[in-house]
């Protein structure tokens, strides 16, 4: 999938946890694709959304291994990056995530991410979770499929 075509007409983009991990930790597997997504969203002034649970998912491993520098790097990234908003889990998001879990058999974190994307009006969802492609209410963009 060509990124510029996949994001054509997208004004609100949701980014799942894994792209933030690849980017912040400079993980080579999908770093080029993630950098391209961030560059595209910044150049095209696309509102980018993620959930507050993203920070929790990102810092769990660094906390486990006492990597306070990496924890701080994540916190700085989410506080200072332009055009990226963190959305709290509301009652509506929680209820919608339950519907998604019931309909698609999603794990709770995945359902919360997708529910947040839907409730905030996102047209596309960037992830590396191939299993999420079964969700039909939203355009699911897989990092591993981007060129």
Task: State the predicted function of each range.
Residues 77:
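An acidic/histidine-cluster motif and surrounding catalytic segment
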Residues 17, 52, 110-114:
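Conserved glycosyltransferase catalytic-site signature
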Residues 54, 81:
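Histidine/lysine/aspartate-rich catalytic loop segments that bind and position anionic ligands
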Residues 86-89, 140-145:
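Short acidic-hydrophobic, aromatic-tinged amphipathic segments that line or gate anion-handling sites
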Residues 2-4, 84-126:
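Active-site neighborhoods of divalent-metal-dependent phosphate/nucleic-acid chemistry enzymes
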Residues 1-50, 63-72, 130, 143-147:
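Short, well-structured N-terminal submotif of metal-dependent ribonuclease cores
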Residues 130-138:
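Short loop/helix-cap segments at secondary-structure boundaries that form the rim of catalytic
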